[in-house]
């Protein structure tokens, strides 16, 4: 075979390999960190629903805009767009046109990022380009499960002595589990002084979680957000290195403030280390109810906190529903109501 023929073949092979690498590059990079543990997470671009997909019609939300093109501008729906302010993408109900820019998830302009090995926090993600404050970085995706499946998975992982799994609570009874299926967002580490945040958006009636920059991020800088860590057992050491580091992942910020409705329904990302949960003191479950519920005559409603499967507490109003003890109707701060057998739940009365 002539040297020119061999050179041509080698060039063809290189082109084929480059094309193949481009096609599977994302999957290859995602799988690499867990090979030592014989775990290969599957790369996905969209959430996979293992529970019934609750998708409301766009018109039911009543969110739309009437943005018009400003003179000399080529784009619509900037920072003053009604939909964007309410964390909802523009839809067919809006009066804006195809120039609309308030569609961060649909347009899928995912920022360039790289997987790296950190000194103390395992693998992490660094920006591979400059990112401006407020820009969409990536969607947090995984398997969407309910509390029942979440609890079952936690127990299975506990039996396997597995500690690496990733949960993001969308709302009550809906959790994104990126343990086995996800994208690069599952490797973003925690920081007590993060440069990104999770936002819960309504996209064509579907609730989705996006990660957005909270400040300008330089190329090569590690991406972080506050896990709002929820765990079972002792606090875990934090190695974020921030000046305001809380030292423990389970610790709360030093400055306290009143929880707003917006904060109450904000998604909570949890990197959980499983340990046997401590039982609440018996006095917490003391409700002062007799068999007929007479103790509630003077005040039929009380403010309580209910704990979900990953240990996060949700504030709710509880009222007597029947004369059967421990059967109540609760309404959470996001307006969702639920009938609960309180003797099967972990809860406590809010006194403050």
Swiss-Prot record:
Q: What class of enzyme is it?
A: transferase
The AWS domain covers 60-109
Which GO MF terms does the UniProt record name?
histone H3K36 methyltransferase activity
E.C. designation(s): 2.1.1.-
For this protein, what reaction is catalysed?
L-lysyl-[histone] + S-adenosyl-L-methionine = N(6)-methyl-L-lysyl-[histone] + S-adenosyl-L-homocysteine + H(+)
Tell me its family: Belongs to the class V-like SAM-binding methyltransferase superfamily. Histone-lysine methyltransferase family. SET2 subfamily.
> What species was this sequence derived from?
Arabidopsis thaliana
Q: What keywords does the record list, in alphabetical order? A: Centromere, Chromatin regulator, Chromosome, Methyltransferase, Nucleus, S-adenosyl-L-methionine, Transferase
Localization (cell): Nucleus; Chromosome, Centromere
Looking at the record, the residues that make up the SET domain are 111-228
Instruction: Indicate whether Nucleus appears among the record's keywords.
Output: yes
* One Gene Ontology term from the biological process aspect of the record: methylation
Q: Give the transmembrane region(s).
A: none
Broad class of the protein's primary localization: nucleus
Ranges of residues in domain Post-SET: 234-250
One protein family per Pfam: SET
> GO terms for CC?
chromatin; chromosome, centromeric region; nucleus
Q: What does this protein do?
A: Histone methyltransferase.
Name of the encoding gene? ASHH4
Name of the molecule in the record: Putative histone-lysine N-methyltransferase ASHH4
């Amino acid at each position: 075979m002539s040297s020119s023929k061999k050179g041509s073949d080698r060039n063809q092979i290189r082109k084929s390999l480059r094309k193949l690498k481009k096609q599977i590059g994302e999957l290859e990079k995602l799988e690499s960190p867990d090979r030592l543990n014989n775990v290969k997470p599957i790369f996905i671009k969209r959430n996979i629903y293992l529970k019934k997909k609750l998708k409301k019609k766009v018109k039911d939300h009543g969110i739309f805009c009437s943005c018009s093109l400003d003179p000399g501008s080529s784009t619509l729906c900037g920072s003053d767009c009604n939909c964007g302010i309410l964390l909802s993408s523009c839809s067919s109900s809006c009066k804006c046109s195809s120039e609309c820019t308030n569609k961060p998830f649909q347009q899928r302009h995912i920022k360039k990022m790289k997987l790296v090995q950190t000194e103390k926090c395992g693998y992490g993600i660094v920006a591979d380009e400059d990112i401006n404050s407020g820009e969409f970085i990536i969607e947090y995706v995984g398997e969407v499960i309910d509390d029942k499946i979440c609890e079952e998975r936690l127990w299975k992982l506990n039996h396997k002595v597995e500690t690496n799994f990733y949960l993001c609570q969308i709302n009550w009874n809906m959790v994104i589990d990126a343990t086995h299926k996800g994208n690069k967002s599952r490797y973003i580490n925690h920081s007590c002084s993060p440069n990104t945040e999770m936002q819960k958006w309504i996209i064509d009636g579907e609730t989705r979680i996006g990660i957005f920059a909270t400040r300008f991020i330089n190329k090569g800088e590690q991406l972080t957000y506050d896990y709002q860590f929820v765990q079972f057992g002792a606090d875990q050491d934090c190695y974020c290195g921030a000046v305001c580091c809380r030292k423990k992942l389970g610790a709360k910020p030093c400055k306290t403030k009143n929880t707003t409705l917006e904060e109450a329904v904000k998604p909570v990302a949890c990197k959980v280390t499983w340990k046997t949960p401590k039982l609440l003191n018996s006095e917490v479950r003391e409700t002062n109810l007799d068999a007929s519920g007479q103790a509630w005559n003077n005040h039929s409603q009380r403010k309580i906190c209910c704990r979900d499967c990953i240990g996060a507490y949700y504030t709710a109003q509880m009222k007597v529903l029947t004369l059967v003890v421990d059967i109540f109707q609760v309404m959470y701060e996001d307006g969702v109501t639920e009938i609960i057998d309180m003797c099967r739940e972990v809860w406590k009365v809010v006194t403050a």
